[in-house]
Amino acid sequence: MAYSMSDLKKGLKVEIEGVPYKIVEYQHVKPGKGAAFVRVKMKSFFDGRVLEKTFHAGDKCEEPNLQEKNMQYLYHDGDHFQFMDVESYEQIALSDEQVGDVAKWMTDGMTVSILFHNNKAISVDVPQVVELKITETPPNFKGDTSSGSKKPATLETGAVIQIPYHVLEGDVVRVNTELGEYIEKVK
């Protein structure tokens, strides 16, 4: 299916010259003279670069052949991350580059969403909120409890976040994976 200028909106996935993009910014412009046009910023699913493009009336772009699958993260063998399709039990291996920054939030057995373009894995998404155990954080000292103060903490996955002083080593915390921020301590 082809999208016309009027179909474009933020969050829409489009394909231009064989590359799938997600529209991250959308602006409809009506100049005083001439025809209206749409200016968009699109992020590539392949390499993450952002492309700015202007669409005029009559311009078309294609809908990409994208398929999203829920897969279970099994383990990391040093070179690749191993995933299993939860429906067909088929396993795939993705390189560190294919998985990207979300690797720091993944734990064994976690269900992740993998996006495929023409049956090739192009991105991995983890849930927006995950629960992880704190494996290392400095001890608290008297007087450390001033409001708004935070300290660094290393999570079970190796990621480092800032946490409040009342949270201790061994505690489980909820983390926003998009922002990389502490949300709350799990009771």
UniProtKB/Swiss-Prot annotation:
GO terms for biological process: peptide biosynthetic process. InterPro entries: Elong-fact-P_C (IPR015365), NA-bd_OB-fold (IPR012340), Rib_uL2_dom2 (IPR014722), Transl_elong_fac_P/YeiP (IPR020599), Transl_elong_KOW-like (IPR013185), Transl_elong_P/YeiP_cen (IPR001059), Transl_elongation_fac_P (IPR011768), Translation_prot_SH3-like_sf (IPR008991). Pathway: Protein biosynthesis; polypeptide chain elongation. It holds the Pfam family EFP_N. One of its GO terms (cellular component) is cytoplasm. One of its GO terms (molecular function) is translation elongation factor activity. It is found in: Cytoplasm. Keywords: Cytoplasm, Elongation factor, Protein biosynthesis. The keyword Chaperone does not apply. The keyword Hydrolase does not apply. PANTHER family: ELONGATION FACTOR P (PTHR30053), ELONGATION FACTOR P (EF-P) FAMILY PROTEIN (PTHR30053:SF12). Belongs to the elongation factor P family. NCBIfam families: efp, PRK00529.1. Involved in peptide bond synthesis. Stimulates efficient translation and peptide-bond synthesis on native or reconstituted 70S ribosomes in vitro. Probably functions indirectly by altering the affinity of the ribosome for aminoacyl-tRNA, thus increasing their reactivity as acceptors for peptidyl transferase. This is Elongation factor P. It comes from Wolinella succinogenes (strain ATCC 29543 / DSM 1740 / CCUG 13145 / JCM 31913 / LMG 7466 / NCTC 11488 / FDC 602W) (Vibrio succinogenes). The gene is efp.
